[in-house]
């Protein structure tokens, strides 16, 4: 897609949310959905700055988290009640982020701002890559999120579940060398008593992830196969 096709306002098909687009979009190549009529749904893409991202990894949460931080789901108009737009999601994340970032870190920062502003209607895992770094971001409920820098000697094998199992909140809310998150994530965890660790080591997978039979039958099997 080129600059000539850039729009100043992005209106999403599924959620009807309006997101203003900044100036200075770069050219990028993406893999859109082959079926028209449901939005772009780009699975992945690379832009002119050689930054890549993928944003179609559906993950899961649990009732405790979603009760405290509901997904931002589109509500159609009913009678005299106007419609309520939903958040952003898989159909638009690549389009809203990739043309405007020059590094993987910038990708995390831009998507993080969008999530905190508009929320999301689904749980997703998103990867960002440039010449020097790879970052993995996972959404938590509506506007909350967290991201980790993938070490150079590691790789990510992620099934359809929330998978980050270690997180340094001090770094994420401070220098952000290897971790980033939504600005109020620490308060969110404390307010709703989501930290289930007994040893003082916060495990996001225990706090935010799913723990049901489908994980054992489906997701854990995918991990073993991919590794």
Locate each region found by the language model:
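Single conserved hydrophobic/aromatic residue that forms the stacking wall/gate
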Residues: 1-7, 11, 223-227
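Soluble extracytoplasmic regions of secretory-pathway and membrane proteins
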Residues: 5, 137-139
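Extreme N-terminus nucleophile/cap motif
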Residues: 5-8, 12-19, 123
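Short linear motifs in intrinsically disordered
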Residues: 11, 30-36, 114-119
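N-terminal accessory/precursor segments of enzymes
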Residues: 15-102, 140-221
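A conserved hydrophobic secondary-structure block that centers on an alpha-helix together
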Residues: 91, 97-123
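Short beta-strand scaffold segments in enzyme catalytic cores
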Residues: 124-129, 134-136, 145-147
């Amino acid at each position: 897609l080129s600059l000539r096709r850039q729009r100043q306002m992005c209106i999403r098909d599924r959620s009807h949310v309006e997101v203003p687009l900044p100036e200075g979009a770069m050219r990028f190549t993406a893999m859109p959905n082959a079926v028209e009529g449901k939005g772009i749904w780009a699975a992945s893409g690379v832009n002119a700055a050689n930054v890549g991202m993928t944003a179609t990894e559906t993950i899961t949460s649990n009732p405790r988290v979603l009760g405290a931080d509901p997904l931002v789901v589109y509500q159609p108009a009913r009678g005299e009640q106007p419609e309520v737009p939903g958040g952003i999601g898989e159909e638009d994340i690549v389009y809203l982020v990739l043309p405007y970032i020059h590094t993987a870190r910038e990708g995390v920062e831009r998507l993080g701002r969008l999530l905190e502003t508009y929320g999301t209607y689904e749980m997703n895992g998103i990867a960002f890559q440039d010449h020097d770094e790879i970052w993995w971001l996972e959404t938590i409920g509506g506007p909350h999120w967290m991201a980790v820098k993938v070490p150079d000697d590691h790789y990510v094998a992620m099934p359809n579940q929330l998978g980050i199992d270690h997180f340094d909140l001090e770094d994420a809310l401070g220098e952000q060398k290897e971790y980033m998150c939504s600005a109020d994530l620490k308060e969110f965890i404390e307010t709703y008593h989501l930290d289930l660790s007994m040893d003082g080591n916060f495990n996001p997978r225990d706090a935010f992830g799913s723990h049901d039979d489908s994980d054992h039958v489906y997701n854990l099997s995918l991990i073993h196969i991919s590794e």
